[in-house]
């Protein structure tokens, strides 16, 4: 994980952006002084005018989180599109959870298969599910 974090942070610092698994760009467009202190991150030209010292990109420490959370969002969205194409319409999606009414255990299995295969990864993506009479009764 440390190696991945260092690699992603370095890309954010060097390129000013990283890409999620779905290809969306997460930008790091603000700059701040290299020296530790309380500085307001600014666009590059403003930072050059404001701070008379070497600059670095701001918030690159958030790159790994943006990669993970952004990729999870991409995967959830692809899963929802795949479900929709099969005529399965989720009621609500919150973060990485999807609420769906089902008619049978076979349909539950089908939904899990669709969601697990929506994004091809080297390590298989597993979908957990919980069932209940209504959303409020699921623990």
Q: Over which residues does each language-model region extend?
A:
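Conserved catalytic core of nucleotide polymerization and phosphodiester-bond processing enzymes
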Residues: 1-139
